[in-house]
Design a protein with these regions (language model features):
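Short N-terminal "domain-start" leader segments
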Residues: 1-29, 83
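Mixed-charge, Lys/Arg-enriched low-complexity segments
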Residues: 33-84
């Protein structure tokens, strides 16, 4: 069950990614989902807190976009996640 968290969506080139930093029953985790390909670029990775999770998700998304088409990560608008 989700306790708290944030998420952001990126659309650049032909890519659509969702970045997550969330606290749940397993602890605080960061992840990145590729909406276009319907797979996880970075599945749940344990982090110390929500802010570190945001940083890790951004790093994974930035690396993926550079590798997949030399694309730059635009500025993000983080939104609060809904509780389950």
């Amino acid at each position: 069950m989700l306790d708290q968290g944030v998420w952001a969506e990126v659309r650049v080139g032909g890519e659509q990614l969702r970045l997550f930093s969330e606290r749940n029953a397993q602890g605080v985790q960061a992840s990145v989902y590729n909406v276009t390909a319907k797979n996880w670029i970075a599945p749940s990775e344990p982090v110390d807190d929500i802010e570190q999770g945001k940083d890790r998700a951004v790093a994974h998304a930035r690396a993926y976009l550079r590798k997949s088409g030399n694309l730059e990560l635009p500025s993000l608008e983080w939104k609060k996640s809904n509780s389950a």
